[in-house]
Amino acid sequence: PEDMNIYQYVCNLDEKIDTILVDEAQFLTKTQVYQLSDIVDYLDIPVMCYGLRADFKTNFFQGSGPLMAIADSIEEIKTVCECGKKATINMRFINGRAMSDGEQVVIGGNESYKSVCRKYYKKYIQESKEVK
């Protein structure tokens, strides 16, 4: 939850924690990102976060920017676009049509995503505009 104080939660646990793994870290708040850094710096517990850097509109998620700004290290998981180049953007499709607008987070919708390079992102957006 957005109002959860992760640092306090970890401090109140009875058992010893070896490592904290955070999936979908893009959904963390900026405050929670800094709480995780406090866990690393003051409690000496390693934290590993996994998540998307940017949304389908190429904007940072609320947690992505702060996390990338203060992370001790960043390891990118590489994916490949259909053209063979490095995929850097998660393209949203609804009913087979590339989307460049809409809500950042959609739950339970009929959307799908595909990893594409910047060139193919522009190509899909242009094709989508021509279909209108």
Model-derived segments and spans:
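Conserved P-loop NTPase "ATPase switch" module shared by AAA+ and STAND
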Residues: E15-L28
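Inter-Walker segment of RecA-like/P-loop motor cores
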Residues: P1-D18
